[in-house]
């Protein structure tokens, strides 16, 4: 069958025999995307994009709609699993030098930004306390743009404050962006199949390739099954694991929560934003925390593609992971000592990875050439 059908034969390409479990996260991300789109569709059927009815419509979905609680919890927990998979996927790309496949990496970075935008718009929709205030804080960052900032913010809000028009357009954007993500995911996969996948050794896989199906397709199915099992376990036993307690109260513009914070998957970027006392500087740092990923294909200096055989670069990589976790943790804390200093130090270390990595590559090259 795969040999006969052109669509199947073009997608089930031979792959290097030694690709590890870290290569399964692409298919897991596609599963998450399918799950989020389908559950989101059923939620959109019952949701009302009105500031007076949005919170009530969420309660209606949970209590009155048959299996509405399943759809709502799958969608909320699925978003967290989506980001767990995408961050692992990016970390794998950094570790094994997959960013050298430039167009795949750049399209992936755009996908990440689209996904973050979609998740942000979705977080506003329940119109709970944290939804409202997170939207207020993040959209307010647009005012930091010189000259046009205030006009741009008013245009986005559809008025002089976050109100009914804001919720309506956020719902429209949250509905349409996943289809853009699906389209760009297709481009991402086509670009990957253009050059083929890399492997843990960073060597040319052409000398030892095996059919994708059944060898790697079953491996993909195993990891996807584990992920879906984990999703259902969380949904059954701890459905509110990733939810903020503040969001169980309806949005009140007159009462500010003690500590405004977005969902956990935005905390590292939010932590970098908060660590800089200047509004414009913080906004630029927030953007750069994601945009800096686009520099890696152009700053790779090592003769060796993967970090598998580069112990010093491995140390640098795991420092980056520890820094990412530290920034995420500090962003959950109030803006007071010692968290301000920890956050600032961690932010400097985060960005310095992308500067030290090329320098370390040159040093390694020099060391390998000396006898």
From Swiss-Prot:
The chain crosses the membrane at residues 25-45, 69-90, 105-125, 170-190, 218-238, 280-300, 312-332, 339-358. Heme b b566 binds at residues 89, 188. The keyword Phosphoprotein does not apply. Binds 2 heme b groups non-covalently. InterPro entries: Cyt_b/b6_C, Cyt_b/b6_C_sf, Cyt_b/b6_N, Cytb/b6-like_sf, Cytochrome_b, Cytochrome_b_C_euk/bac, Cytochrome_b_N_euk/bac, Di-haem_cyt_TM. Its main location: mitochondrion. A ubiquinone binds at residue 193. Its cofactor is heme b. It is a multi-pass membrane protein. It is found in: Mitochondrion inner membrane. SUPFAM superfamilies: a domain/subunit of cytochrome bc1 complex (Ubiquinol-cytochrome c reductase), Transmembrane di-heme cytochromes. GO terms for biological process: mitochondrial electron transport, ubiquinol to cytochrome c. CDD domains: cytochrome_b_C, Cytochrome_b_N. Pfam families: Cytochrom_B_C, Cytochrome_B. One of its GO terms (molecular function) is metal ion binding. Gene3D superfamilies: Cytochrome Bc1 Complex, Chain C (1.20.810.10). The keyword Transport applies. Keywords: Electron transport, Heme, Iron, Membrane, Metal-binding, Mitochondrion, Mitochondrion inner membrane, Respiratory chain, Transmembrane, Transmembrane helix, Transport, Ubiquinone. GO terms for cellular component: mitochondrial inner membrane; respiratory chain complex III. Heme 1 (or BL or b562) is low-potential and absorbs at about 562 nm, and heme 2 (or BH or b566) is high-potential and absorbs at about 566 nm. Belongs to the cytochrome b family. The cytochrome bc1 complex contains 3 respiratory subunits (MT-CYB, CYC1 and UQCRFS1), 2 core proteins (UQCRC1 and UQCRC2) and probably 6 low-molecular weight proteins. Component of the ubiquinol-cytochrome c reductase complex (complex III or cytochrome b-c1 complex) that is part of the mitochondrial respiratory chain. The b-c1 complex mediates electron transfer from ubiquinol to cytochrome c. Contributes to the generation of a proton gradient across the mitochondrial membrane that is then used for ATP synthesis. This is Cytochrome b.
């Amino acid at each position: 069958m795969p040999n006969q059908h052109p669509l199947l034969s073009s997608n089930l390409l031979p792959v290097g025999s030694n690709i590890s479990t870290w290569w399964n996260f692409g298919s897991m991300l596609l599963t998450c995307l399918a799950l989020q789109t389908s559950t989101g569709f059923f939620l959109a059927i019952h949701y009302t994009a009105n500031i007076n009815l949005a919170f009530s419509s969420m309660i209606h979905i949970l209590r009155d709609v048959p299996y509405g609680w399943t759809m709502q919890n799958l969608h909320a927990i699925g978003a967290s699993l989506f980001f767990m998979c995408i961050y692992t996927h990016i970390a794998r790309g950094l570790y094994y030098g997959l960013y050298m496949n430039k167009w795949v990496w750049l399209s992936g970075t755009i996908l990440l930004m689209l996904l973050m935008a979609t998740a942000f718009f979705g977080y506003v929709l329940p119109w709970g306390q944290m939804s409202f205030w997170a939207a207020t804080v993040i959209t307010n960052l647009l005012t930091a743009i010189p000259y046009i900032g205030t006009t741009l913010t008013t245009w986005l809000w559809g008025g002089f404050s976050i109100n009914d028009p804001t919720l309506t357009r956020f719902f429209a954007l949250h509905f349409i962006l996943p289809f853009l993500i699906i389209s760009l995911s297709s481009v991402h996969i086509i670009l990957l199949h253009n050059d083929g996948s890399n492997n843990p050794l960073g060597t040319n896989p052409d000398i030892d390739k095996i059919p994708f199906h059944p060898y790697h397709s079953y491996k993909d199915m195993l990891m996807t099954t584990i992920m879906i099992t984990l999703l259902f376990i969380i949904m059954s036993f701890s459905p509110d694991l990733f939810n903020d307690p503040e969001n169980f109260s309806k949005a009140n513009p007159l009462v500010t929560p003690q500590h405004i914070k977005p969902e956990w998957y935005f905390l590292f970027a939010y932590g970098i934003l908060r660590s800089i006392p200047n509004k414009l500087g913080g906004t630029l740092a927030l953007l750069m925390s994601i945009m800096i990923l686009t520099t890696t294909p152009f700053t790779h200096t090592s003769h060796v593609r993967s970090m598998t055989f580069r112990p010093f670069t491995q140390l640098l990589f795991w420092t980056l992971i520890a820094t990412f976790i530290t920034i995420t943790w500090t962003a959950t804390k109030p803006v007071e000592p010692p968290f301000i200093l920890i956050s600032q130090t961690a932010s400097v270390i985060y960005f310095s990875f992308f500067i030290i990595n090329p320098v370390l590559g040159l040093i390694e090259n020099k060391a390998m050439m000396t006898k």
